[in-house]
């Protein structure tokens, strides 16, 4: 059926260690299974993924709260799995000179260490079996609505990032290890002067929302504040 497709993949991951003794290579097998389909003006994609690490490598970085030695360490077996959903719908009729695409996307991610170990890294620290990997949000959601024409394109988008822990652990997240939910609105536009040259403009964090993104290094870190940029783009 031209409107429905199913796909699957298996990928072997590998990352070599440094020349320090006692380190093993990072190794993983990553699986995905999904479908893409179209129903009239609706396009959808649903993908499930499962990443199986037989050994994950970590690094002692000052940026992640460690001592900054850059030493790597074996984190052991780790499991990461979840689902991604993408929906796209054009509000106007296909015969219209304008397009009004609406896009929704969602990602759910589960993580789990499958063994116990200890490291000097400030973010990972002492790990117990069943702990979640820090700095990975379980829920992420994005939405956008745009207007497209031969001369003009404009898009308003929103980004939701669910709360996440800044230290490995399980269960409820302690207040001093929590980065809370955040929602940020962005805007992008392009005007085509001719078929070769266009004017582009972007606004990140339209409402200048204050939100947190990290607790390392050296305490709480905010996300990008209001930022606007403009430029020319040429295509030949």
Explain the meaning of each model-derived region.
Residues 29-33, 44, 71, 81-85, ...:
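Hydrophobic, lipid-facing positions within transmembrane beta-strands of outer-membrane proteins
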Residues 1, 5, 43-45, 99-101, ...:
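Membrane-spanning beta-strand positions in outer-membrane beta-barrel proteins
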Residues 73-168, 198, 202, 207-208:
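Gram-negative outer-membrane beta-barrel transporters
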Residues 6-9, 27-93, 97-117:
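Membrane-embedded beta-barrel scaffold of Gram-negative outer-membrane proteins
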Residues 54, 99-101, 113, 160-169, ...:
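C-terminal beta-signal and adjacent terminal beta-strands/loops
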Residues 2, 35-39, 89-91, 147-149, ...:
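Residue-level signature of outer-membrane beta-barrel architecture
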Residues 17-24, 56-64, 109-122, 166-173, ...:
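Outer-membrane beta-barrel translocator domains and adjoining extracellular loop/strand segments
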């Amino acid at each position: 059926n031209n409107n429905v497709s199913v796909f699957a993949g298996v990928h072997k991951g590998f990352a070599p260690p440094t020349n320090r003794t006692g380190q093993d290579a990072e190794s993983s097998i990553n699986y995905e299974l999904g479908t893409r389909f179209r129903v009239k003006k609706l396009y959808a994609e649903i993908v499930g993924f499962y990443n199986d690490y037989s050994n994950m490598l970590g690094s002692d970085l000052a940026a992640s709260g460690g001592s900054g030695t850059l030493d790597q360490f074996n984190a052991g077996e780790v499991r990461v799995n979840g689902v991604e959903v993408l929906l796209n719908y054009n509000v106007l009729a296909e015969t219209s000179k304008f397009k009004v695409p609406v896009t929704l996307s969602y990602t759910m991610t589960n993580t789990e260490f499958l063994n116990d170990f200890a490291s000097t890294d400030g973010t990972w620290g002492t790990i117990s079996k069943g702990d979640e990997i820090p700095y990975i949000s379980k829920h992420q959601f994005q939405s956008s609505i745009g207007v497209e024409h031969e001369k003009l394109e404009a898009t308003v988008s929103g980004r939701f990032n669910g709360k996440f822990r800044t230290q490995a652990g399980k269960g409820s997240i302690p207040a001093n290890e929590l980065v809370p939910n955040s929602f940020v609105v962005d805007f992008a536009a392009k005007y085509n002067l001719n078929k070769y040259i266009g004017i582009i403009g972007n606004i990140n964090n339209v409402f200048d929302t204050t939100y947190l993104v990290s607790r390392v290094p050296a305490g709480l870190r905010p996300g990008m504040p209001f930022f606007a940029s403009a430029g020319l783009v040429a295509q030949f």
